[in-house]
UniProtKB/Swiss-Prot annotation:
GO molecular function (one): zinc ion binding
Disulfide pattern: 94-100
Induction remark: Regulated by the imd/Relish pathway.
Annotated membrane topology: Multi-pass membrane protein
Record protein name field: Peptidoglycan-recognition protein LF
Residue ranges crossing the lipid bilayer per the database entry: 24-44, 144-164
Organism: Drosophila melanogaster (Fruit fly)
Domain of life: Eukaryota
Family statement drawn from the similarity comment of this UniProt entry: Belongs to the N-acetylmuramoyl-L-alanine amidase 2 family.
Main location: membrane
Length: 369
């Protein structure tokens, strides 16, 4: 009987083993490529984060703080912008996100309902929690300082900083926002920083924050160039702002156009903040009325050390003897080159408005005092 021969096929298991090894190798190569790409992307992101001005900057958009939509249209900013104006909100501060959101909604409601604005007036606000809250953003003109919305971006610190400094993280967040503005080409690299008080009769952004600002690299001490851009070269603090009392009796009209301007010294201590200078001007008015028997403060304007012009009798009313009734009298609290420069700008404005003759004469009694 013939034997049955069983033929085996040793090649098949060998082929399966080779295929398994090949697939394993292929899988490992793909895995290594994915891991390599992920690692490379991670390193790139780490490098980007390290060198980006955006590192640590957290911005909450309007939808995140539940802002109301604008009630109307508003004009766009021409970018990049060259000027930053720093404010404080003159409200309570906030250290936590939920409190800052509440402050944002309150400020927006106040601006829209009390001022009649179409939206919150600031471009950005900075919370004490170290976060940025978007107001009107980079693209829309603000209503933060009258006449300057088209040529500046406003950054308001949430809080009141007359007697206390903002926390370090609030200041750092504002600086990072400005760096981000340059990176995004929303700000010019050589932008200028100003305080609200340099452009308007206000304490904003508060004395303590203003003192800190003066150490910032891009802070600009002289606001003349910005005033020229806004067609405003002189900041006049009107009588209601310094809480002037009314004249005792009606004043004598000043004959226009004025042919002569006289600079005189008040011979009183200097002042360097609006609060101090307002106090000095009010003391002068009280002294002139109660001690000297004048009808009112006996100057037309007062140039003070805070680089503001304070309206006294103004353009329309003449001073009393021993002053010449036909002269415009500008008094100086602490005469200096800076407030003398502003007084000369006041004269230019007076000529432009038709109050002062183009051929006026200037009598400078400051040199005698």
């Amino acid at each position: 009987m013939p034997k049955t021969v069983v033929v085996t096929h040793p090649g098949k298991p060998i082929n399966n083993e080779k295929r398994f090894r090949f697939e394993l190798l292929y899988f490992c190569v793909i895995l290594l490529m994915v891991v390599g790409l992920a690692a490379g992307y991670f390193m790139w992101m780490m490098s980007f984060s390290t060198h980006s001005p955006n590192k640590g900057l957290h911005i909450l958009d309007r939808s995140e703080w539940l802002g109301e939509p604008p009630s109307g249209k508003y004009p766009h900013l021409k970018l990049p912008v060259s000027n930053i104006i720093i404010h404080h909100t003159a409200t309570e501060g906030c250290e936590q996100e939920d409190v800052c959101i509440y402050r944002m909604k309150t400020i927006q409601a106040f601006h829209m309902k009390s001022f009649g604005w179409v939206d919150i007036g600031y471009n950005f606000l900075v919370g004490g929690d170290g976060q940025i809250y978007v107001g009107r953003g980079w693209h829309i003109q603000g209503q933060h300082v009258n006449g300057y919305g088209a040529i500046s971006v406003s950054i308001a610190f949430i809080g009141t900083f007359v007697n206390m400094e903002p926390p370090a993280r609030q200041i750092e967040a504002a600086k990072r926002l400005m760096d981000e503005g340059v990176r995004l080409h929303r700000l010019q690299p050589d932008y200028h920083i100003y305080a609200h008080r340099q452009l308007s009769p206000t304490e904003s952004p508060g004395q303590k924050l203003f003192e800190l600002m003066q150490n910032w690299p891009r802070f600009t001490q002289d606001p003349t160039s910005l005033r020229l851009l806004s067609n405003e070269t002189v900041k006049i603090v009107t009588r209601p702002y310094w809480l002037a009392q009314p004249p005792i009796v009606p004043l004598t009209p000043l004959k226009l156009p004025i042919e002569s301007v006289r600079f005189v010294a008040t011979n009183t201590p200097s002042c360097f903040t609006q609060a101090e200078c307002t106090f000095r001007v009010r003391l002068l008015q009280n002294w002139h009325i109660e001690s000297n028997g004048y009808k009112d403060i006996n100057y037309n304007f007062v140039a003070a050390g805070d680089e503001n012009i304070y309206e006294a009798r103004g353009w329309d009313h003449s001073c009393e003897p021993p002053k010449d009734a036909d002269e415009l009298v500008v008094a100086f609290i602490g005469p200096s080159s800076s407030n003398k420069k502003i007084a000369l700008e006041l004269i230019k404005q007076g000529i432009k408005l038709g109050h002062i003759s183009k051929n006026y004469s200037l009598i400078d009694d400051l040199e005698k005092s």
